[in-house]
Design a protein with these regions (language model features):
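Elongated, amphipathic alpha-helical interaction scaffolds
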Residues: 1-202
Length: 202
């Protein structure tokens, strides 16, 4: 009898993880998983809106945030491609333009965050060569892509500091070590909010 492999639903785990990462600043942010961009089936993985414009987000992965923050997540099996960049960039332009009033959302109020497990070398080389964008490492697993109207960052989950970004950093297929799993379970223990409950994928 052939063994069936259980498929891990990575996106619900990501949606829970991204919210937990900002748990100390929830009052500043509004999370909208799978935010629909239009009546047609076009959606972004996560839209994070700053509740108060004058409050800065202190979390390391949110320091780049402005008012409207568009997040694209790739599962550990997936890769971030050049097409993905332009798709999400197009979504960001659409989100900025799809308003009641002209210029209701200013481009500088929109940021783009790409989250993936593998460093997208081909995509980065393309952006450097054809769009003259620059990339620099801001912190462990955090890269800023500069030179565009939209502030853009790239998060490589396996490179993130587990002390600062435990939940996103744990979105990997190789979380197998006994100590690591025990630590995650201990951290999870006693959390009864819905966001933590969704992380029972582990």
């Amino acid at each position: 009898m052939q063994e069936t492999t259980k498929r891990i639903e990575w996106h619900p785990a990501f949606q829970a993880s991204i919210q937990i990462e900002f748990e100390n600043e929830w009052e500043k942010l509004s999370f909208e998983p799978e935010h629909l961009l239009s009546k047609k089936p076009m959606q972004i993985d996560e839209l994070i809106i700053k509740v108060k414009d004058n409050e800065k987000v202190q979390k390391n992965i949110g320091k780049i945030f402005r008012k409207y923050n568009i997040i694209e997540y790739k599962s550990p099996d997936d890769y971030l491609t050049i097409n993905d960049f332009y798709k999400v960039y197009g979504y960001s332009c659409f989100y900025q333009a799809d308003t009641e009033n002209v210029f209701e959302i200013q481009p500088q109020e929109v940021t783009i965050t790409f989250i993936c497990n593998h460093y997208p070398r081909t995509m980065i080389q393309h952006l450097q060569k054809y769009r003259d964008l620059k990339i620099h490492k801001e912190g462990a697993g955090i890269y800023y892509i500069t030179g565009d109207e939209f502030p853009i960052q790239l998060l490589i989950t396996k490179e993130l500091n587990p002390e600062e970004n435990l939940w996103l950093q744990s979105l990997r297929k190789d979380v197998k070590g006994k100590r690591e799993i025990e630590f995650l379970l201990k951290t999870y223990e006693g959390k009864n909010i819905q966001t933590y409950i969704r992380l029972q994928w582990m």
